Amino acid sequence: MPWIQLKLNTTGNQAESLGDVLVESGAVSVTFQDTHDNPVFEPLPGETRLWGDTDVIGLYDAETDMADVVAMLECHPQIGKGFIHKIEQLEDKDWEREWMDNFHPMRFGERLWICPSWRDVPDPTAVNVMLDPGLAFGTGTHPTTALCLQWLDSLDLNGKTLIDFGCGSGILAIAALKLGAARAIGIDIDPQAIQASRDNAQRNGVSERLELYLAKDQPAELSADVVVANILAGPLRELALLISVLPTTGGHLGLSGVLATQAAGVAQAYEDKFILDPVAEKEEWCRITGIKK
């Protein structure tokens, strides 16, 4: 069925309360979008962060009398008469099919493919990780995930142990296992990430070789031949002492979730314990790798 979209602009501080007003006016869903198309980086646990200049978008049934909606909004103290807004009719589409059509198998390095379950595998002889895109966790589309997957593909992981620190969907740990790692350990602060990793590991037939822990429950004295942490620059700096002890001597470290402009600050936190490689960049993001001294 077709829909009607109402868009209005506000500040990040007022966006959520304005979204509630749109729901009260009959919107069946409300979304927030940056007016200037800037990214919002991952918030701290329990924190909701929006842009300073935010578009609030309400979706209404096509039968809705939008004149009545506008009149109601004009009477609301947070909005008032003459508020600037845009109303448009949305084309009726099979949104689920259109969404699925946007995702295709992706190749990382020489051997590794990430494939949605509804697509044919391009190369049955390659290393294929079956992973469907979701809302919260990595699927290879983000440059930082791509950088980490390319790095894992370049390593000899046969018989090795890997720690995925901040595992999210489990994509990096699962890819490592399918690339030959004997064992992988996924750690995350989010219980939903642990469940997503568990489900994805089962779908890929590697669940028996993947151990998963909430960060607060991770065993003491963990170590691995390879450690990858695709999180954010701030946590990578703050947790440098914890992460640095995880690789064995001569082991590999891979860090991402870092903007190219943040690379020097993150590298500085690890350079005492690692021989660092040149920074790899993709778009505005980068990857820092090295060998444990």
Curated annotation (Swiss-Prot):
Keyword Methyltransferase: yes
Gene3D superfamilies linked to this entry: Vaccinia Virus protein VP39
Short name of any one Pfam family annotated for the protein: PrmA
Catalytic activity from the UniProt record: L-lysyl-[protein] + 3 S-adenosyl-L-methionine = N(6),N(6),N(6)-trimethyl-L-lysyl-[protein] + 3 S-adenosyl-L-homocysteine + 3 H(+)
InterPro entries recorded: Ribosomal_L11_MeTrfase_PrmA, Ribosomal_PrmA_MeTrfase, SAM-dependent_MTases_sf
SUPFAM superfamilies per record: S-adenosyl-L-methionine-dependent methyltransferases
Keywords from the UniProt entry: Cytoplasm, Methyltransferase, S-adenosyl-L-methionine, Transferase
GO biological-process terms attached to the record: methylation
Location relative to the cell: Cytoplasm
Family per record: Belongs to the methyltransferase superfamily. PrmA family.
Name of this protein: Ribosomal protein L11 methyltransferase
Species of the source: Yersinia pseudotuberculosis serotype IB (strain PB1/+)
Gene expressing this chain: prmA
